[in-house]
């Protein structure tokens, strides 16, 4: 049967389909109820329902967006190996359900701040493939003007505050954003994402304490992919139940490979944070690549373990099965969609390669508050003299 047509969303990564995919086969707007793969495990709160309201449009949108994220990260791997991406590069393949599920539960008024595994979060916030690949290759059209690279994506107009390279340091910044939201009486929350490797950082507990003390709308999200830079969680944490780490702060453990479980948990957490203050979400997820491109990812875990997760828990395959079981598309139509996605990614890479490098003067922008930078120092300032022609 023909593929249902996706409605346009505020998220610009949803592209119009070719004519073959634009045939509207149903005007049925009846909600689809989907059961989460696993029950939620709660700490100091009642868990949300496992029944999640969705629609045919959302299911198809989830599949396409997650497939796009996966293809983008695989392409980044190839570009890095071809030395077109320099410096650090941390890939997100395997964890796409967290990005897409979280985005489905919130609005662009809600803020997100994360660590260095940030490409897919940026895409979910409305960033474009062209911005992604331009930034990765240090080009002028990048989301951070080619200066940030893989670890420092940013999109202020969509309340995405990075992209941070210091382990755990984004969490107190996120709580600061939540403080501003409460101070300004905004009906919005902040999601501060961190990994299991950052969960033992002292600043995380300090930020959580002040957030609880002041009832800030802060949601701390531990993306537990079970390995730090090469250290299994059991070797670094006496208590790996990260959703309980707040002690006096409620928490929820979520199947982070199930986009609908993530959506339901984030929706629940947002309501809680607006009414009662901070909450911790632990997303039980998995990364397929190593910690970074310099890590093969197979010295501290077996290849059988990785392939086992791919076969049994892959987040995209889970959505694909739901699409097929609800007769929203055929196998062939989904494969054709994936071909379109590959072309879209290839076109974005080609466009980014043609983009010029930043001007040397760009080194001095976004360093100081506007009005207090090099433009106010005069021609004798040493920073200005150091600027390359």
UniProtKB/Swiss-Prot annotation:
Induction: Induced by cadmium. Residues 1-32 form a transit peptide. E1 activity is regulated by phosphorylation (inactivation) and dephosphorylation (activation) of the alpha subunit. Mg(2+) binds at residues 196, 225, 227. GO terms for biological process: pyruvate decarboxylation to acetyl-CoA; response to cadmium ion. The pyruvate dehydrogenase complex catalyzes the overall conversion of pyruvate to acetyl-CoA and CO(2). It contains multiple copies of three enzymatic components: pyruvate dehydrogenase (E1), dihydrolipoamide acetyltransferase (E2) and lipoamide dehydrogenase (E3). PANTHER family: PYRUVATE DEHYDROGENASE E1 COMPONENT SUBUNIT ALPHA, PYRUVATE DEHYDROGENASE E1 COMPONENT, ALPHA SUBUNIT BACTERIAL AND ORGANELLAR. This is Pyruvate dehydrogenase E1 component subunit alpha-1, mitochondrial. It comes from Arabidopsis thaliana.
């Amino acid at each position: 049967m023909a593929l249902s047509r996706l409605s346009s969303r505020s998220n610009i990564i949803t592209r119009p389909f070719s004519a073959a995919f634009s045939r509207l086969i149903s005007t049925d707007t009846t909600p689809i109820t989907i059961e989460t793969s696993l029950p939620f495990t709660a700490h100091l709160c009642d868990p949300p329902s496992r029944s999640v309201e969705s629609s045919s449009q959302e299911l198809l949108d989830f599949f396409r967006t997650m497939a796009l994220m996966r293809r983008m990260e695989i392409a980044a791997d190839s570009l890095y190996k071809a030395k077109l991406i320099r410096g650090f590069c941390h890939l997100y393949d395997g964890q796409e359900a967290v990005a897409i599920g979280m985005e489905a539960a919130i609005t662009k008024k809600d803020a997100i701040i994360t660590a260095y595994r940030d490409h897919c979060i940026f895409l979910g916030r409305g960033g474009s493939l062209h911005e992604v690949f331009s930034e990765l290759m240090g080009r002028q059209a990048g989301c951070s003007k080619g200066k940030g690279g893989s670890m420092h994506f940013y999109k202020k107009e969509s309340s995405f505050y990075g992209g941070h390279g210091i382990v755990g340091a984004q969490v107190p910044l996120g709580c600061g954003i939540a403080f501003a939201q409460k101070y300004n009486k905004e009906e919005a929350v902040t999601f501060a994402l961190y990994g299991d490797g950052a969960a033992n950082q002292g600043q995380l507990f300090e930020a959580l304490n002040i957030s609880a003390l002041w009832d800030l709308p802060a949601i701390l999200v531990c993306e537990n992919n079970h390995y730090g830079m090469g250290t299994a969680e059991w070797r670094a944490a006496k208590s790996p139940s990260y959703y309980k780490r707040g002690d006096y702060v409620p928490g929820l453990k979520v199947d982070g490979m199930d986009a609908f479980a993530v959506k339901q948990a984030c929706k629940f957490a947002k309501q809680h944070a607006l009414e009662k203050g901070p909450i911790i979400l632990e997303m039980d997820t998995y990364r397929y690549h190593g910690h970074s491109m310099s890590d093969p990812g197979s010295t501290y875990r077996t290849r059988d373990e990785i392939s086992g997760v791919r076969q049994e828990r892959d987040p995209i395959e889970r959505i694909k099965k739901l699409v097929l079981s609800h007769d929203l598309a055929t196998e062939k139509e989904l494969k054709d969609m994936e071909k379109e996605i590959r072309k879209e990614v290839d076109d974005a890479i080609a466009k980014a390669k043609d983009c010029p490098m930043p001007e040397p003067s760009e080194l001095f922008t976004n360093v100081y508050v506007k009005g207090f930078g090099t433009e106010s120092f005069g021609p004798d300032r040493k920073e200005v003299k150091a600027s390359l022609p």
